[in-house]
């Protein structure tokens, strides 16, 4: 039998499962890429991008996804599952490194659900189901906030009374698993050393940027929740708190309505009135869609300026995640607005998504490095085995 580990990443309507082979106590190839999603009243089940089945929803969708996976898994007699790894978005102030799952840990993490209502409930539901079904093996949690535990108190604090900081109301930062992968695998991907002062732009449906100093997180654009920072697909990013007070007092909106607005109806979707998909907006002739793209770029450029100030300089800019690693248009727009830094982009290399897209004469190196959060979780899981 072949030893494997399973990496799970759950959303509100989808479940991604990666299965990695283990050889000589090292992570080897990914042998299965499994994706289950809720689509209208059906659950679609894909294995290595090929549709396996379509099932009508008759119960809790996430539970059904796990059950469908389990039915398939029972047929994989040649594979021996030795551990699972799970991405959990928010670790709060108490979890700053990967941990082994137990009931106490799950209970503590449930308290953090209000800080990440789009992700945490589903992350924990899947974790709990695997924990109950596969009790004989280890289950390891990796947190998106852990990478930022090297941030100093001054970068974490809000200008609120200290009692709130003591309660955990502070800046945490997110997308840490992505930043950890890009920074730790940078040399093997680009064949260059990671410079001392780097900024990584994780641009996807959720977007953030991180200042990396000597391989460690110095500060990042996201704060207490995944709403903060640059504008995203459906989230507004940095927002004056007075706007929320106005919506409550003058628009008479409820907390649930505001939550829906900020998490699901703002950002590129809200600004364009057309789509949250960057490819659709770039191709659109709509004035509002063009404005949404321009605002997305503008907010990123402003954030890069803040991070340069925190780093006291910049040696390189790295693009990653769905938009960052696949959209030459967005990379070019951002780079042009940073031309005052001496950034020069090679047009052909940028169009081909090559790893280094800056010219030899560029004062700041610019890279495209695909992220791999599943692999970094798998590598962390192996440290426990």
UniProtKB/Swiss-Prot annotation:
Amino-acid positions noted as binding Mg(2+) in the UniProt annotation, renumbered to this chain: 9, 373
Enzyme class: transferase
Source taxon at top rank: Bacteria
GO CC, alphabetical: cytoplasm
Family annotation (InterPro entries): Ac/propionate_kinase, Aliphatic_acid_kin_short-chain, Aliphatic_acid_kinase_CS, ATPase_NBD
Annotated positions for site Transition state stabilizer: 175, 235
Catalysed reactions, semicolon-separated: acetate + ATP = acetyl phosphate + ADP
Keyword Flavoprotein appears in the UniProt entry: no
UniProt-listed Enzyme Commission number(s): 2.7.2.1
Cofactor, free-text remark: Mg(2+). Can also accept Mn(2+).
Name of one Pfam family that matches: Acetate_kinase
Pathway(s) annotated for this protein in UniProt: Metabolic intermediate biosynthesis; acetyl-CoA biosynthesis; acetyl-CoA from acetate: step 1/2
Residues reported in the UniProt entry to bind substrate: 87
GO molecular function per UniProt: acetate kinase activity; ATP binding; magnesium ion binding
Subunit: Homodimer.
Similarity comment: Belongs to the acetokinase family.
Function (record text): Catalyzes the formation of acetyl phosphate from acetate and ATP. Can also catalyze the reverse reaction.
Protein name per Swiss-Prot or TrEMBL: Acetate kinase
Organism taxonomic ancestry: Bacteria, Pseudomonadati, Pseudomonadota, Alphaproteobacteria, Rickettsiales
């Amino acid at each position: 039998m072949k030893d494997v580990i399973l990496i799970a990443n759950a959303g509100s309507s989808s479940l991604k499962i990666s299965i990695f082979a283990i050889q000589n106590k090292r992570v080897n190839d990914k042998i299965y890429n499994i994706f289950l999603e809720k689509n209208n009243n059906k659950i679609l089940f894909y294995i290595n991008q090929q549709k396996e089945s379509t099932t009508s929803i008759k119960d809790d969708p996430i539970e059904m996804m796990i059950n469908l996976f389990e039915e398939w898994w029972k047929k994989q007699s040649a594979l021996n599952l030795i551990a699972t790894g799970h991405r959990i978005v928010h670790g709060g102030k108490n979890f700053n490194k990967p941990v082994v799952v137990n009931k106490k840990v799950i209970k503590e993490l449930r308290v953090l659900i209000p800080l990440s209502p789009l992700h945490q409930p589903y992350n924990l539901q899947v974790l709990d189901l695997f924990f109950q079904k596969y009790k004989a093996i280890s289950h390891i949690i990796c947190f998106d906030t852990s990478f930022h535990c090297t941030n100093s108190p001054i970068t974490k604090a809000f200008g609120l009374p200290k009692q709130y900081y003591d309660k955990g109301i502070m800046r945490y930062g997110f997308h840490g698993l992505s930043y950890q992968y890009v920074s730790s695998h940078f040399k093997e991907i680009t064949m260059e050393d990671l410079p001392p002062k780097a900024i990584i732009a994780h641009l996807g449906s959720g977007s953030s940027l991180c200042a990396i100093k000597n391989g460690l997180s110095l500060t990042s654009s996201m704060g207490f929740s995944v709403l903060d920072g640059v504008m995203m697909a459906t989230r507004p990013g940095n927002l004056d708190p007075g706007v929320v007070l106005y919506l409550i007092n003058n628009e008479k909106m409820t907390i649930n309505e505001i939550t829906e607005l900020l998490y699901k109806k703002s950002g590129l979707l809200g600004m364009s009135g057309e789509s949250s998909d960057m490819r659709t907006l770039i191709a659109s002739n709509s004035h509002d869609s063009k404005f949404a793209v321009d605002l997305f770029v503008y907010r990123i450029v402003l954030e890069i300026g803040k991070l340069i100030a925190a780093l006291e300089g910049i040696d390189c800019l790295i693009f990653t995640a769905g938009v960052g690693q696949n959209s030459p248009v967005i990379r070019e727009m951002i780079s042009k607005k940073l031309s005052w830094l001496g950034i020069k982009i090679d047009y052909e290399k940028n169009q081909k998504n090559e790893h280094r897209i800056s010219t030899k004469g560029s004062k700041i190196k610019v890279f495209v490095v695909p992220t791999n959060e599943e692999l970094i979780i798998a590598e962390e899981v192996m440290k426990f085995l």
